[in-house]
Amino acid sequence: MNINKFTQKSIEAVNNCEKIAYDYGNQEIDQEHFLYSLMTIEDSLIANLIEKMDINKDTFIKNIETLLSQKTKVSGNVNLYVSNDLNKVLVNAEDEAKRMGDAYVSVEHLMLAMIAAPNKAIKQLFKTYGITRGKFLSVLATVRGNQSVN
């Protein structure tokens, strides 16, 4: 994973995960933290796209918060680490960017990588809301058109 190929919003989303994990008392930074970050960063494209899929953004975020509150909690001064599932998303997002002809990894590539390889909890969440690659790409096309991230 080459962080220099990530857009500012992508870097912001990655960086926010540590605080989210800390706030929830989690040692492992996982896809739930990342999806929450993608949904709650300022001017979130992902939140906009979720709403374009006729999903209530606030309810969706509340469901992610529920997943976060169910994760194993630790106390004290602990070292945070990234889960294998989240690492896979971060690495595969570069492939998503290349597939779309983009030079940089943006938040939509990160979301597509998560849709392609969700962990168990995120897979169930996406299933509940009917979030699929095709549906996501369809709403993305209405926002992005044929622009690329270069």
Predicted features, each with a name:
Residues M1-N150:
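Histone-fold recognition with a strong bias for associated Lys/Arg-rich disordered tails
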